[in-house]
């Protein structure tokens, strides 16, 4: 029954795609968020040309990290993606939530927050299965940190969301607390339903750790000048 619930939750996740925050607009162009999207696109092009060897070289291999080897991959892996759907899905989520968090933190603080969130999420995934020799990659953990920060900062904002149920497709509006909270619930149930080595390539612990990091540190990264002007 638990497996069935997990599958249903995962299906629901795929049917709710956040597009934008309809409750507010950032006060400036989200240059850092746009740069992150562009950098991920460039790296994905390099993956397509470099093949599996390129991906393996720059992905996190938990056993290597535990042994103190290839530590730079803790940073590089968060800019790699395994497929077109992987990168497109991640960048859509980032663009839905990133601009507002960049605005409230300031570009510099937001860039540091994003990178640290990505590192924390990668290390959490390593801790779950430290002996693994399977590559771990993707921006999902860092983006989960952004979502966790959004949950704390703007829980009541209305998120323009693409809702897909079978052949039924429509745009609707969902409160951020409901949308992000539901997403986090999916990650928790999914992590509990499968062993770390049988997660189908999905780093659920990285998602959970990223979201927790973002939620607990969001206020620390807020721009004090913006708050004073507030």
Regions found by a protein language model. Give the residues of each.
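A detector for small-residue-rich transmembrane helices and their helix-helix packing motifs
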Residues: 1-230
């Amino acid at each position: 029954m638990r497996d069935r619930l997990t599958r249903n939750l995962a299906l629901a996740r795929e049917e709710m795609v956040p597009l934008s925050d309809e409750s507010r607009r950032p006060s400036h162009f989200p240059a850092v968020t746009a740069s992150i999207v562009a950098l991920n696109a460039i790296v994905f092009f390099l993956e397509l040309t470099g093949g599996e060897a390129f991906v393996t070289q720059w992905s996190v291999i938990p056993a290597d990290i535990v042994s103190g080897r290839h530590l730079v991959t803790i940073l590089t892996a968060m800019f790699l993606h395994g497929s077109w759907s992987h990168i497109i899905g991640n960048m859509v989520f980032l663009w839905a939530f990133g601009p507002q968090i960049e605005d409230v933190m300031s570009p510099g603080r937001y860039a540091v927050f994003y990178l640290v969130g990505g590192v924390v999420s990668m290390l959490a995934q390593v801790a779950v299965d430290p002996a693994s020799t399977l590559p771990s990659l993707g921006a999902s953990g860092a983006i989960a940190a952004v979502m966790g920060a959004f949950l704390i900062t703007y829980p009541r904002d209305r998120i323009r969301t693409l809702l897909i149920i079978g052949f039924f497709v429509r745009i609707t509006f969902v409160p951020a607390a409901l949308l992000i909270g539901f997403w986090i619930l999916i990650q928790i149930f999914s992590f509990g339903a499968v062993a770390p080595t049988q997660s189908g390539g999905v780093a659920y612990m990285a998602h959970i750790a990223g979201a927790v990091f973002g939620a607990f540190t969001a206020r620390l990264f807020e721009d004090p000048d913006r708050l004073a002007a507030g």
